[in-house]
Amino acid sequence: INLYKLVSQSHLKYYRRRPRVPKSVFLEHRDGLLIGSACEAGELYQALLRNAPEQEIARLVDFYDYLEIQPLGNNAFMIADEKNDTVNSKEDLIELNKKIVRLGEQFQKPVVATCDVHFMDPQDEIYRRIIMAGNGFSDADNQAPLYLWTTEEMLEEFAYLGSEKAEEVVITNTNKIADMIEKISPIHPDKFPPVIENSDRDLKEMCFQKAHEIYGEKLPQIVEERLNKELNSIISNGYAVMYIIAQKLVHKSNEDGYLVG
């Protein structure tokens, strides 16, 4: 339920160019959710980049349920970034990932290796390139390997941690997190239509009233059977309120002099 609430608020209340929610709101609805430290744009990684004090790092780590490290190619763009003076080589990126691993050990937080997947297969990067170019990104042609890596690829990528630690972050911990997550549907199985009192009754009365105006006091059997069949389908599926809303809108528009087609 909290996840649905956050998704709704991110789109309806806090939307600004993209869905988002303040951290304070996140905290209000945290129950039942697992929060990871995210990619290089996450606050933990950014704090490490600017060599934040240990106290601040500890506070940030404490907030998360698990910490994330990602393939070097995901963050290789920082090596050539003139605004960044912390990362100058592949070795610097390795050291950042190792720091996160050490923090996980120090604060007893599971560390998981994630791909930051933006597309399924390597060849699909062309679609992200097109989208980024259309949004004005000057570096759209420099695509990071943000596809879904295989287990073997991830183990090879994180071999610098040692085989035992690589298996822990790639396989063991990721499965632990996955096992903690229940299966949910992104769309709730219930319909949640708006509520207007007595919609079912009112729709039935309006339909039969109109039918009697057209066919007289006694309805032909074929008309009555068809009317009951249609109404039963609408009402039993919870859609009566939709028809009532449409009727009210059309009636109000006509009343105000606007033709509705």
Locate predicted features:
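Phosphodiester-processing cores and adjacent nucleic acid-binding clamps
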Residues: I1-G261
